[in-house]
Amino acid sequence: MGKMGNSFYKYYQPNKKDLKDECGDCSIRALTKYFGVEWLDIFDGLVKYSRITQFMPNNLTNIQKYLDDKCVPYVKCYNPKARHKTTVLDFAKAHKEGKYIIYCRVGYGTHLVCLDNGVYYDTWDCGDRIVYGYWGGIG
C-alpha cells in the first residue's frame, strides 16, 4: 500500500544502485514494471535509440521509438480546454485491469509511471499529476 493509505500507489524501485531515489530514471522504472524485465535491460535497450538521436536514454523521443518498435500504442488524452483534467489517481481508479505507461508532467518536466491492474508503481506518489497520455492497455 502507498503512503497515507492510498491503495492505488505502491513504492517501486528496480534500480539497485539508486538507494536514495535520486536518479531521475522514471521512464526506465516504468518500462521495467511494464515489461517485467531488469533495469539494465531497459537501459541497454534505450541506449540503442540514444546513439541514433543523441538524446539521453530516458528522453521521451527514445521512449516513444522504443515503444513503437514493440508495437505498444499511444493514446493522447490531455485536453487543455477540458474543465476536469484526469490525474494519475483518477486514471488508476478508472483502469483497474491492464498495464499502462502513463505520461504526466512534473513542473516543466516529463514523468512516466506504470499502472498495473489499477495500482501505479513509482518511488513517490504522483497521483495528483495530470495525465497527458498513455501507452498500452495490455491485459
For each of these PLM feature ranges, what is it?
Residues 113:
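Short acidic-hydrophobic catalytic motif
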Residues 49-107, 116-125, 131-132:
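Conserved active-site-adjacent core of cysteine acyl-enzyme catalytic domains
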Residues 133-139:
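Charged phosphate-binding loop/patch that engages nucleotide di/tri-phosphates or the phosphate backbone
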Residues 1-74:
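Active-site nucleophile-adjacent alpha helix/oxyanion-hole segment immediately C-terminal to the catalytic cysteine
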